[in-house]
Amino acid sequence: MTIRYPSGQQPPNVGRAEQPIVAPHSSSFAKRGMSLEKEINDANRYYLATEQAVIYKKPTPIQLVKVDYPKRSAAVVKEAYFKRPSTTDYNGVYQGYYVDFDAKETRGKLSFPLKNFHQHQVDHFRRCLAQGGVCFAFIRFTTLDLTYLLPASDLIAFWDQQGRGGRKSVPLTTIKDRGFRVKTGLTPVLDYLPALDQLIAANQAKGADHE
């Protein structure tokens, strides 16, 4: 089956078998060449196997273009296109909380460009927050080897300011101040639950202040 992006290009990983998780010998060696998405996926599989959290990457919607029916009881998809996801990349449950987030990388050293997000993703964050969800942006500065969880509420605030003529990026200094650092380890390489615990605790503290 041929699966293509809207541009007509084929995705790089179609047809490849999912690789098993192998415990790395050192965090620096294990991280070499790994994308943020792969590290998150590996961490999620580890959390699922150890019954710490149930978090999955949402499948990308596919638009079918050509389907053959060699048999009445079977259909064979010959060509399809990946559609733009309608929400965010990941969601699941952790300690009774609904968790929803998206992962982005930037090679910048001073700020994170807001153009990496889309309006529909920000709107989705708003809806999830209104229902009490724990939402955030996974942001990695690749050249600095820094990864943070930025609360969705802060991302939304900068997004709205951008629409009113404000800056079109979030300064790294702000992300360090309002976000939660995700440190690397061994198994998993990107252990983000401690940072998520900090975010949940901060949300609870804010809730207590408003009671």
Curated annotation (Swiss-Prot):
Task: Supply the SUPFAM superfamilies for this chain.
Answer: Restriction endonuclease-like
Report which reactions are catalysed by this protein. Endonucleolytic cleavage at a junction such as a reciprocal single-stranded crossover between two homologous DNA duplexes (Holliday junction)
Keyword DNA repair present in the record's keywords: the answer is yes
Does the keyword Cytoplasm feature in the UniProt annotation? yes
Q: Name one GO cellular component term.
A: cytoplasm
Query: Pfam family of this protein, just one?
Result: RecU
Name the residues that bind Mg(2+): 87, 89, 102, 121
**Molecular function in Gene Ontology:** endonuclease activity; magnesium ion binding; nucleic acid binding
InterPro entries listed in its UniProt record: Resolv_RecU (IPR004612), Restrct_endonuc-II-like (IPR011335), tRNA_endonuc-like_dom_sf (IPR011856)
Task: From the record, give the transmembrane residue ranges.
Answer: none
| GO biological process entries | chromosome segregation; DNA recombination; DNA repair
Keyword set for this entry?
Cytoplasm, DNA damage, DNA recombination, DNA repair, Endonuclease, Hydrolase, Magnesium, Metal-binding, Nuclease
Marked site (Transition state stabilizer) residue numbers: 104
Protein family membership: Belongs to the RecU family.
What role is this protein assigned? Answer: Endonuclease that resolves Holliday junction intermediates in genetic recombination. Cleaves mobile four-strand junctions by introducing symmetrical nicks in paired strands. Promotes annealing of linear ssDNA with homologous dsDNA. Required for DNA repair, homologous recombination and chromosome segregation.
This protein is called Holliday junction resolvase RecU
Species annotation = Limosilactobacillus fermentum (strain NBRC 3956 / LMG 18251) (Lactobacillus fermentum)
